Regions:
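Positively charged n-region of N-terminal signal peptides that target proteins for export
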Residues: 1-4
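Bacterial N-terminal signal peptides
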Residues: 7-17
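Exported/periplasmic ABC-transporter solute-binding proteins
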Residues: 21-52, 56, 65, 69, ...
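Short glycine-biased active-site loop of nucleotidyltransferases that positions the nucleotide triphosphate
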Residues: 71-72, 100
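Acidic, polar ligand-binding/catalytic clefts
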Residues: 78-104
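Residue-level signal for tight coil/turn positions that link beta-strands
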Residues: 104-106, 136
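Serine endopeptidase catalytic core focused on the charge-relay Asp
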Residues: 109
Length: 284
């Protein structure tokens, strides 16, 4: 993330009255990966939680890597992320307490309907990326260490490829999120890896089509991590515990997640995945 944006974010959290975690009370600060914000699920959860519990949640959006960096400064109470390796590192270094499963959706590989690389219908993302690389067809990456970028790089690794060359374009504004990245990809007639929720939210505004989907490697797990109060005493631990309990409840947020997007898109944008939800469905 650019240095000036870091400064703006820190000013928002530290200098503006009413937005400091140090004030405690009925207020939770959340640093969230951008995709769930763009889809509307974060706002829907925040609004219903405030109605149910009278506790306000406010968020700042950033790629997972940047969101975790904000939390490492102690400027938020909770993080919503989707990059397991970065999340585990964050916890191991003492910044967060635990990785709590919340929900999941999936990534898809999108590209022009004409499909110059010939990947449509391939069963695995690895096969598709090999063909894109092998044909030198334009591919756009966020390149910002966000959860989406980390997932993309894991897929390249599974394919045994280190992407580089004129065909592999790192979008200079990738840190702004998946929607701008998807629009840029569309303008270039290129391929990219994107979460399905983002694609569905603007599919009527772009020409790109979903070409590869359904590979287990494309699943996108989203979790929440409470920031460690032992490291940052000003963290609003009490209200975070209430929020996490509500988020993971099969009778509360998990039902909202289950149904979110059905009316508009004909299918949900996310699937509930808390331990409590899985247990209630007969899982382990």
């Amino acid at each position: 993330m650019k240095k000036w944006l870091w400064i703006v974010l820190l000013c928002i959290f530290v200098l503006i009255p009413g937005l400091s975690a140090a004030q405690g009370g009925k207020f939770i600060l959340l640093a969230s990966t951008i995709g769930p914000i763009d889809s509307g699920i974060v706002g829907a959860l925040e609004d219903q939680f405030e109605k149910d519990k009278g506790i306000r949640v406010r968020h700042v959006g950033a790629g997972t890597g940047a969101a975790l960096k904000i939390a490492e400064k102690g400027n938020v109470d909770l993080v919503m992320a989707h990059a397991k390796s970065l999340e585990e590192k964050f916890i191991k270094e003492g910044f967060g307490t635990e990785r709590i499963p919340l929900m999941y959706n999936d990534f898809v590989i999108v590209g022009p309907a004409a499909d110059p690389a010939g990947i449509k219908g391939l069963k695995t993302a690895a096969e598709a990326l090999k063909k894109i690389s092998g044909t030198g067809t334009l591919f756009v990456s966020r390149g910002d260490k966000s959860g989406t970028h980390m997932a993309e790089m894991e897929l390249w690794a599974k394919a045994g490829i280190k992407p580089a060359g004129a065909w592999y374009v790192v979008y200079e504004k990738g840190a702004e999120g998946n929607v701008p990245t998807l629009r840029y990809t569309d303008s270039k007639g290129a391929y990219t890896v994107i979460d399905r929720a983002t694609y569905l939210s603007i599919k009527d505004q772009i020409k790109l089509a979903v070409l590869v989907e359904g590979d287990e490697a494309l699943l996108n797990y989203i979790s929440v991590i409470p920031v460690n109060k032992k490291k940052f005493p000003r963290v609003n631990e009490k209200d975070v515990k209430t929020f996490v309990k509500w988020l993971t409840s099969p009778q509360k947020a998990q039902k909202i997640i289950r149904d979110f997007g059905k009316a508009k898109y004909g299918s949900p944008l996310f699937f509930p995945n808390s331990r409590e939800w899985v247990k209630a469905q007969g899982g382990k």
